[in-house]
Amino acid sequence: MSLENLERINKLHVEAPDQEEIKNLILAASERLSDSQKTGLSYSSRFDLAYNASHGLALAALRAAGYRSDQRYIVFQCLQHTSGLAKGRIRIFSTCHERRNLAEYEGHYEKDEQLLAELIDAGNALLTEFQV
């Protein structure tokens, strides 16, 4: 579904890009991605850092396109329109969003180092799109 169609059904809101907001989202995400690779931290801390970094970058991409969403998962779904990432990498974000929700809201905790590594890799790929 296009960004315009998502706006039409009230999943997105048109909002002019704010360069300061976008810059700060990218900066915070960059720091979180870096911290997520510190092996001295627990798995859950590293996952939270990588997930929140990726969400911040996806939100920055959406904001740069002139939209905002009130729903976390939508920013990941919009990456097919707001980034050059391959669909496989975008699916990693969706999988991690589902895992995050299971852990946060249902107490289902599953440690998966491979998924975390893929999340960090996908987050770094998204971060690279913002670097000139």
Label every PLM stretch briefly.
Residues 1-132:
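Terminal alpha-helical segments
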